[in-house]
Design a protein with these regions (language model features):
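Conserved structural position within tetratricopeptide repeats
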Residues: 50-53, 92, 98-99, 139-143, ...
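Short coil/turn linking the two alpha-helices of tandem helical-hairpin repeats
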Residues: 66, 71-80, 117-126, 158-167, ...
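N-terminal leader/linker segments that initiate helical-solenoid repeat arrays
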Residues: 23-77
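Structural signature of tandem alpha-helical TPR/SEL1-like repeats
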Residues: 41, 78-92, 125-137, 165-179, ...
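Alpha-helical adaptor scaffolds
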Residues: 116-117, 129-131, 140, 144-179
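Terminal, low-structured helical/coil segments at or just beyond the last alpha-helical repeat
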Residues: 200, 208-244
C-alpha cells in the first residue's frame, strides 16, 4: 500500500473517530424524549418543512433543520446511504445558515459535524482537504463563542485522534476537553474522550473521575445517546480499569 493511501486511510479513520465522538451530540436537544423517539423525528422535520414552505426561510429554521437531519442520521436511519444523504442535507442547511449569518457559531459547528459525518461514509477521497475544512469551521465556532461546549469537544477529539505529524497534540486535546467540560459538563461525551486520553497516559485515577461523571450525571444532554452509547462505554471502561 502506498504511503499516500496509508495517509488517506489514517485521515478518514481520524475523521470517523472525531465525527463519531460528536455527531450523536450535534442535533436537537431532546431533554425529554417523546415516547416514539426516534420515529418522532420525521414528524418534527415535516412540521419544520411545512413552516418553511408557508412562512419562509429564517436563520433559526435552517439551524433547526440541520440539527434535525443530524439526529435523523444518527438515531433513526440505519442504512449508510440514508445516513449520508441526511448528513448532506444537514450540511446544506448549515451552509445556507452561514450565508445568512457568517458569525453564527452553532451553524459553523453543525456544518463541521454534518460534513465530517457525510465524508466518513464516503471513504478516503479528499480526506485531508475535508479534515482541514472541518477544523477551520470548528475553530471559527470557538472564536465566535469561546464557551461552545460541543465545538470545544470536537476540537479536543481531533487533537486527541490526529497523529503528531498531522497536528495531533495530547496537551491541546486535554485543554480543549477540559474547557468543554467546564462550559457544560452535561455533554458527557467530552468526559468519555478525556477519560480515554487519560487512560492512554496512565492517569487512571483522573480517568475514573470522568467516567464516574458520565455515570452519575443528572439530566444529561441527549439522553438517547447517553443511554445507548455513552453510559455503556463508561461502564465498560470503568470495569476494565477496576480489573486491571
Amino acid at each position: 500500500m502506498s504511503a499516500r493511501r496509508q495517509c488517506g486511510y489514517r485521515l478518514i479513520a481520524v475523521l470517523g473517530l472525531a465525527c463519531l465522538s460528536l455527531s450523536a451530540t450535534a442535533g436537537v436537544e431532546h431533554e425529554s424524549l417523546p415516547p416514539d423517539y426516534p420515529d418522532s423525528l420525521e414528524r418534527e422535520l415535516a412540521a419544520l418543512q411545512a413552516k418553511i414552505a408557508t412562512q419562509g426561510v429564517r436563520l433559526d429554521r435552517l439551524i433547526a433543520g440541520a440539527e434535525l437531519y443530524l439526529d435523523i442520521a444518527d438515531d433513526l436511519f440505519e442504512e449508510d446511504t440514508q445516513k449520508r444523504l441526511a448528513y448532506e442535507a444537514a450540511a446544506e442547511m448549515a451552509r445556507r445558515a452561514l450565508l445568512m449569518e457568517e458569525r453564527n457559531a452553532q451553524a459553523h459547528f453543525l456544518y463541521a459535524a454534518a460534513r465530517g459525518s457525510a465524508e466518513r461514509l464516503k471513504g478516503i477521497a479528499n480526506a485531508g482537504l475535508v479534515l482541514g475544512e472541518i477544523k477551520e469551521h470548528v475553530r471559527r465556532a470557538i472564536e465566535l463563542d469561546p464557551g461552545h461546549a460541543q465545538a470545544l469537544q470536537m476540537m479536543g477529539g481531533l487533537y486527541a485522534e490526529l497523529p503528531w505529524l498531522l497536528g495531533g497534540s495530547e496537551k491541546e486535546a486535554e485543554s480543549y476537553l477540559r474547557r468543554a467540560i467546564a462550559a457544560d459538563g452535561r455533554y458527557t461525551n467530552a468526559h468519555l474522550i478525556l477519560a480515554r486520553l487519560l487512560i492512554k497516559q496512565g492517569r487512571s485515577g483522573e480517568a475514573r473521575a470522568h467516567l464516574d461523571a458520565v455515570l452519575q450525571v443528572e439530566h444529561p444532554h441527549y439522553p438517547y445517546a447517553w443511554k445507548r452509547r455513552f453510559r455503556p462505554e463508561a461502564e465498560r471502561l470503568l470495569k476494565a480499569l477496576l480489573s486491571s
